[in-house]
């Protein structure tokens, strides 16, 4: 595997939206224990995936609580191929701040970096405050995939990371495979629209 086979992916978003839980659920689903997640203990984890018969190493970076202190710097974004912008579906403020995170990607990220909007904690249906159709509309305007996940139950977690990997593959390697995502917990899959 050479450097071109490594995709650097960042998890960003407000504190306590579940970024570390998503990372741990994806990279080690058999040993995931929600109570064991320590928000300041993870820098990055690796996971190998296959796209079109080719193996890629996803190097997934977590902010490890730095976002609470607004200490995320341009060095964190350096070399990133993709960014999962996460919010908590039960916390409207975390969704409202997504635009600020998108601005930060624009300010510090590589031109053309792939992005996926992720609404986490979709298992908390009775506490949900952010309507998926609003988030989908915003993602459509940006021309990026949107997906709701639950790190607790594992719903759509792998799909979110694979949508990110597919976006990177298409944008940076030249693959033609469109991202197919199941945006909302329990909804049928859909192909990402191309927005002009």
Curated annotation (Swiss-Prot):
Pfam short name (any one): Ras
Membrane topology note: Lipid-anchor
GO molecular function terms attached to this record: GTP binding; GTPase activity
GO cellular component terms given for this protein: lipid droplet; plasma membrane
SUPFAM superfamilies: P-loop containing nucleoside triphosphate hydrolases
Annotated SMART domains: RAB, RAN, RAS, RHO
Compartment(s) where it occurs, according to its Swiss-Prot or TrEMBL record: Cell membrane
Positions of S-geranylgeranyl cysteine lipidation: 196
PANTHER family with a match to the protein in the record: RAS-RELATED PROTEIN RAB
Top-level taxon of the source organism: Eukaryota
Protein name per its UniProtKB record: Ras-related protein RabG1
Key words, A-Z: Cell membrane, GTP-binding, Lipoprotein, Membrane, Nucleotide-binding, Prenylation
Native source species: Dictyostelium discoideum (Social amoeba)
InterPro entries referenced in this protein's UniProt entry, alphabetically: P-loop_NTPase, Rab, Small_GTP-bd, Small_GTPase
Gene designation: rabG1
UniProt family annotation: Belongs to the small GTPase superfamily. Rab family.
Signal peptide (residue range): none
Residues that hold GTP according to the record: 13-20, 62-66, 120-123
Chain span(s) of sequence motif Effector region: 36-44
